[in-house]
Amino acid sequence: MPSNKNTRIENIDFIRGVAVLGILVMNSLIFALPVSAYFNHSSEGATNIIDWIIIFFQEIFISQKMMGLFSLLFGASFVLFLESLRIKGYKKPKLIILWRNFILFLVGVIHAYFWMGDILTIYAILSIILLFLHNRNILLLLFLAVFFTYFSSILALIFQSFFDSEGNLSKTIIEQSIFTDKIGLGKFWFSDSIILGEAMSLYFLVDIACRSLGMMLLGICLYRLNFLSAEFEKKTYINKLIIPGFIVGIILSLISLVWYQIEDYSPEIALIANIPNKIGIIPLVVSYVGLCSLLYKKISNKYSSYFVSTGRMAFTNYLSQTILCFIIFNLLFSSNNFSRKEIIIFVFFIWIIQLIWSKYWMSRFNQGPLEFIWRKITYLGKN
């Protein structure tokens, strides 16, 4: 039986493995289809009932939740890494972690050139805030976690008022010259548009940053409360995390999906209809933490080790997903005319590859290839 420390770390890696695989489900859409298909499901890639079943599953269980789970684990790992630096006796652990995340920022800048949805740069910047907040009172952290995560809902309400019923910038906003390019929802909502525009670019930047920071802070809270340790009883995970989280999260996500359907994906509700889904992020992500922790405790190491290995190589796997998507959807096939079921087949194929190769690699090495390089540069000249 592994020690408590190893169990805690492996459980985090197990959950991270699930998260990095789950992220691909949504990220692949932006490579394979026009950007609008990610948000306006009716715009592209939905030609039959199978496609709509996939959309239903993605929106209820995956969309924003897997990124939320990934962000949560980043927050937890941030504290775990800082603790390990202090235990090892490094004199300036905060400088090391700042340097480590500066490297992450540089990688993210390069990554963003190939992938408009890069989150590494945002994570690296937000790590500065985590450095100042990670050891604050846990009730304050919980409050800030909820506030920042749900601020994106307020943001959606505000930005929706910037657009008219056709998805163009309203006359009032144009007259005030707030956004000089005068572009409305753009390619966020319309498949025939090729420009995102200043308004939606600002919305995305603030939205993603706030949600990421909120979930990172929640991850720190769960870590400090030992919910990521996989040490609680089965009934604790089921009664406190899984059941309430699933019930609340699924209902809220379902409300958003039904709202879009009822309004026939009208530009008038492009942002506000997603608010219930955003509110459902925390409940569902927390339930995933409970479910994954329970699975890690219950299933054989023979099977859990595949996900643990994938999680330990999350940095490598996340970037390799971009490379594979770029090659397949941008170089080999550039029509942007895929159906959802074709994309999900591709996703399953990549899952199998990453699970197998991660297990193979980690059975021979202590770290993934990019993790090894990142670590070497992080500790360069440090003592």
Predicted regions and their residues:
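Aromatic-anchored segments of alpha-helical transmembrane domains
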Residues: V25-S28, F105-A112, F148-I158, I247-I255, ...
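Specific transmembrane alpha-helix
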Residues: G68-E83, L120-F132, D207-A230, K278-S300
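Solvent-exposed interhelical
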Residues: K91-P93, I129-F147, C221-P244
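N-terminal signal-anchor module of multipass membrane proteins
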Residues: M1-L73
